[in-house]
C-alpha cells in the first residue's frame, strides 16, 4: 500500500520552494513522474518474488488503475542475502515469464566482474573487479542468468 501510494503521489504535479541558480528562493512546479513502479525486494516476512506475491502486487496496482508491471530484485531479502541464491530467484522468475505472465517489467541483480565482496580495510590490497559493498554474482553466473532470462522471454513470445 505504501509503495502504491508513493507511485500515485509521484504521478501528480507538485510545487516546492528552493533556491535558483542565483540563490533567490523560487517556487518550482514539477510535471509529475508517470514512470513510478514497484520493486519487490523481499522484507521482514521473507522473499516476495514467487508467482503468488507478484500476482498479488499486480492486483493491488490494478485496483488503482496503475500498470500491472513491476521490477523484481533478485538480491537482498529475496535471496536471503546469499548472493548465489539470486540464480534460484532467476529460475523462478523465468518460469513465471515462460508461463505467459507479463507482470515482470525488469529485474535487479547484484553483479560484478568477480564473485563475492571484500572489506575495504586496506585500499591498497583491494582485488580489482570485486564489490566493496554487497556480495555479487560473478561475470560467468551473470551471463548465465541473463541467458536464462532471454530464453524465458523468447519462450513466452
Report each predicted region and the residues it spans:
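Active-site-facing alpha/beta catalytic cores
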Residues: 1-49, 53, 76-77, 81, ...
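Conserved active-site beta-strand-loop modules that form the wall/rim of enzyme catalytic pockets
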Residues: 36-37, 68-70
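Acidic, Ser/Thr-rich peripheral helices and adjacent loops at domain boundaries
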Residues: 118-136
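Generic C-terminal helix-cap and adjacent flexible tail
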Residues: 151-157
Amino acid at each position: 500500500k505504501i509503495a502504491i501510494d508513493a507511485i500515485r503521489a509521484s504521478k501528480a504535479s507538485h510545487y516546492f520552494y528552493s533556491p535558483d541558480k542565483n540563490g533567490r528562493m523560487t517556487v518550482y512546479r514539477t510535471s509529475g513522474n508517470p514512470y513510478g513502479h514497484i520493486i519487490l525486494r523481499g522484507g521482514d516476512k521473507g522473499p516476495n518474488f514467487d508467482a503468488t506475491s507478484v500476482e498479488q502486487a499486480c492486483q493491488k496496482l490494478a485496483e488503482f488503475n496503475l500498470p500491472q508491471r513491476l521490477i523484481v530484485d533478485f538480491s537482498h531479502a529475496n535471496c536471503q542475502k546469499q548472493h548465489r541464491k539470486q540464480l534460484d530467484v532467476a529460475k523462478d522468475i523465468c518460469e513465471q515469464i515462460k508461463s505467459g505472465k507479463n507482470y515482470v517489467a525488469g529485474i535487479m541483480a547484484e553483479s560484478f566482474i568477480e564473485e563475492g565482496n571484500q572489506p575495504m580495510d586496506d585500499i591498497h590490497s583491494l582485488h580489482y573487479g570485486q564489490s566493496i559493498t554487497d556480495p555479487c554474482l560473478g561475470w560467468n553466473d551473470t551471463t548465465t542468468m541473463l541467458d536464462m532470462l532471454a530464453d524465458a522471454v523468447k519462450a513466452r513470445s
